[in-house]
């Protein structure tokens, strides 16, 4: 599948880091592809993304309205589910909170918002994945060696 997709529907914008940092009192500390987040399958599901924002200056209120936190994106025709949506709030004192997937929250100055966008489900049995495609997945960091062994039956 396609990784870290933004769609022109709903609230699925992929706002550039520079725009976020110029528009809001945040610093983007991480924006990465989530390894092993796409469901295993003959056709692997697209990987989700991990985004980490640090709140600068003052206490900030935010809101979230996300799906697939309780039931991850499903696989089809024998493919496995993708990873679920996750959000956590890291306070400067080390405390971690997990807000609901729909609602408002407060983050103190210097706190972090960690948001993991779900991966999509795979299609078809993982045992039928093309070995060259799986090798590319490993090389690109989309699939870990552990997941290749567990989900695709690759011997190390």
Describe each region flagged by the PLM.
Residues 1-156:
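Glycine/proline-enriched, intrinsically flexible loops and inter-domain linkers
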């Amino acid at each position: 599948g396609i990784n870290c997709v933004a769609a022109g529907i709903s609230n699925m914008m992929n706002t550039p880091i520079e725009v976020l940092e110029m528009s809001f009192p945040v610093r983007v500390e991480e924006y990465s592809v989530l390894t092993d987040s796409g469901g295993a399958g003959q056709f692997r599901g697209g990987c989700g993304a991990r985004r980490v924002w640090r709140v600068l200056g003052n206490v900030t209120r935010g809101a979230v309205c996300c799906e697939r936190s309780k039931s991850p994106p499903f696989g089809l025709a024998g493919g496995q589910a993708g990873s679920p949506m996750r959000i956590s709030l890291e306070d400067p004192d080390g405390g971690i909170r997990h807000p609901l997937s729909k609602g408002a929250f407060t983050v103190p100055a210097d706190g972090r918002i960690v948001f993991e966008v779900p991966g999509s489900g795979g299609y078809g049995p993982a045992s039928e994945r093309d070995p060259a495609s799986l090798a590319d997945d490993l090389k690109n960091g989309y699939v870990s060696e552990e997941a290749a062994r567990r989900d695709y039956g690759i011997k190390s």
